[in-house]
Amino acid sequence: MTAKAPTLRRHPRFRSAILDHARDIVVYLPPRYGTARKSYPVLYLHDGQNLFEPERAHVPGQHWRVGETLDELIVAGRIPPVMVVGIDNTGTSRIQEYTPTSDARLGGGRGGDYGRFLIEELKPFIDRTYRTEPGPASTALGGSSLGGLVTLHIGLTRPGVFGSLVVMSPSVWWDRRVILSTVRRTRPRPALRIWVDMGTAEGRRALDDARLLKAALVGAGWTAGRDLHYAEYEGGTHSEAAWAARFGAVLAWLYGGPRV
C-alpha cells in the first residue's frame, strides 16, 4: 500500500515589508492535526525549496524528505507531533539574507533584517494561522551551510524567541569567521540548546571551523552533552542528501527523549 503523502499547506508569495521580498512558505502539519484539538511545537527551517518536494529542490531530486521523516517518527511514537515551517530562499538574495555581516569580497550582511522578518512578520502570522505553542521552549530554528550560519546569528542576537537551534554544516568561514566573535561576546549567554554538526568529507577547513565553533560555544558557557550537541558524520558531504540522512537524528535530539 502506498504511504499517505505528508500534509503540506502552502502560502505562496508571502510578502515581507522588512526585506521587500516575497517568498513561498510551506507548512508541514503532523498526522491528525485536523482532528486533534491541540497545539504544537514549531521548527522553522531555511531553504524551504529543499525540504519537502524533490521537484522543487535546488538540485532536482535531492531534498531532505522532511515530511516523510516526520510522519515516520511521529507515527512510530519516537517523537511527539510537531509542525515545520519551510521558508523558501529568494535565490539571488540568499547570500544577502543568510549572512550577518558584509564580506569585502562577497557582499551580504542582511541577516539581521532576515531575523526581523522571521520574528516580526512570519512567526506572528504562523501563530495566528495555526495552533502553535508559541513560546521559546517550543520554537526551534534551523538550517544548513549559510542557513546554519544565520540560524546561530539570529539565535544569539535575538534571544527569547527560539529555544533550540539546529546548525548543520555551518559556513563558519564567512567574513573571517565573524560568527566566532559573535559567540565570544554574547553576554549573558542565551538560554539556547544548540546542535552543531559537520561531515568529515566537507573539507579539512570546514571541519576545523566546526571544531573552532564548538570550542567557542563551550568557552561561552555551553556544555557538550547538556545544552550543546556536537557531531561529526563520517563521510558526510556538503549536500542535501547528507543533511536528509541525519535529519531524523536532529528530530530525535529536538523532540525525542531527554532534553540534552
List where the protein language model places each region:
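Non-catalytic cap/lid and distal C-terminal segments of serine-dependent acyl enzymes
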Residues: 1-260
